[in-house]
């Protein structure tokens, strides 16, 4: 690891909600997901996994195929809090090294590990210790521990190792991070030249009343409080040095999906918005899936 690397936005990223510092937001998020992991997740009331169980949502929305679902231990399904399936469009090849930023309970680690095969490796990066332990448990249950490594680290942190990954995936995580440029800097660093990213994340689209946006940010709840406009988000990706940026899919959340996304990982763990406030964001919260490449030097 390169210990001499500097943070991209200072020790304490500036962009925060109007009422909380970046450090406070991250601590709240870490505790929230750790508590959720301690309980082993839940098959109900998940953020993007709207209506009923995580499994039914995934199948219903084609996020994960039936073949995918058959490979995933129940624990990983219950801990799953994604908004897409980056392994389905990441073009992962046998023998590659895949890093999952904010790997959570390991659902995408399992699928990526099957794709890289016995000569490849997957690396789960997450800052919540109990979540990371659950992902280890999941990989063991799936019989894939020999091709999995874990790094317990903030993905905004410059201690993330350099030039080791062919592919970086991330599923519904970067919206939670106060300093998105910091995360994309670390994704750039961990990728080998010519490597690529495949991301599923939550963004906003269309006009959002600034007061409504400020209100959402002040609570920083679920996977909507930190969501930023898609065009600004994609500019951050390009400014980090990535090329060949391509949005491969978008899904606009309906009110029910929005309600569950806004209280991710579940109403017991996260602050919630009133139905009235959520209605003001309806049609404007989108799950976007995109690819980009780190140019060869
Ligand atoms: C919404 S869950 C998604 C988990 C997983 N990707 C999935 O699809 O189920 C967000 C995950 O990102 C992790 N996370 C959030 N912010 C992080 C940060 N700054 N550094 C590392 N992990 C982070 C949380 O601990 C949690 O496990």
List the predicted regions and their residue ranges:
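Short, glycine-/aromatic-enriched active-site segment of Class I SAM-dependent methyltransferases
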Residues: 203-224
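C-terminal lobe and adjacent flexible extensions of AdoMet/dcAdoMet transferase-like proteins
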Residues: 10-12, 34-39, 50, 240-297
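Class I SAM-dependent methyltransferase SAM/SAH-binding core
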Residues: 78, 85, 93-157, 182
